[in-house]
């Protein structure tokens, strides 16, 4: 259950991934991670944690439109917690047809079978029957193992000790109450875009409510003007409630922009919640925030009387897609 997943989140970083067919895995400096939904969140976070890493996150059919030479210089990592994601299986088949170096991350399903059949390196995640969005720690450890980043794995392992999920529940419950009967809009710096996106999808999937996200400074040049409300447009935006993810490590100019935005929004009658990203390290800071997001989304679901675990609309959509073939 999702409650247990949140409470034991730190234990995911005790995970020691086993790479099967490891003899076929070479060392790469460039990567493409193909995954949908919760299965690409670990790669997103990895980009935020180590911006210098050359990694393309691809959430679509096939592969990114790169030249053949460029693709052959990258390890293509196919990530699907269920192992049955249509787009990721298509990416596997595309990579196989083009004879590209690849590896697989999945808990079970067709993707594992394909990896075994084709002798492709793979990590089979432990199946705790959790939603993919709740297995980001496991996916991160598996991704780092395939990349051969042992130093980063060792740093991530410290989260098993430093993360204290239960300590964040009270804050999450309070934030859910403040955000009740509104649509959260999460803003962060561009370098923390992955954190803002995680907050958004947790509100969507766990909380079962609309939520949106964007980044500074880009939104200062467009989206922000949509909230310069007038009498005739007030009804369109009165349900939005802003969540600013502030990071002391951000560029001082970004910090200034967020402070000015906070004033502008409050002057126009909008509610703004400010969350300061804190932690003993960059990765600790990221996951501290994500656990707070989990608790907030969980208690949001409770306030609305919805199931925080399942995603019935996604499952219904998949069935309809399959029926149309």
Feature map (PLM): residue ranges:
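Conserved beta-strand scaffold positions in the cores of enzyme catalytic domains, especially
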Residues: 55-57, 122-124, 211-213, 242-244, ...
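C-terminal active-site/capping subdomain that shapes the small-molecule cofactor and substrate pocket
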Residues: 228-314
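Glycine-rich phosphate-binding loops that contact phosphosugars or nucleotide phosphates
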Residues: 22-166, 177-178, 247-252, 259-267
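Short, small/acidic-rich helices and loops at N termini and domain boundaries
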Residues: 309-325
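Short helix-capping/linker segments at secondary-structure and domain boundaries
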Residues: 18, 146-155, 207-208, 297-310
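Active-site phosphate/pyrophosphate-binding segments
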Residues: 2-5, 11, 22-23, 29-30, ...
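Structural alpha-beta junctions
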Residues: 52-54, 205-212, 263-272
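Short acidic loop-to-helix transition motifs that present clustered carboxylates
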Residues: 59-66, 218-221, 279-282
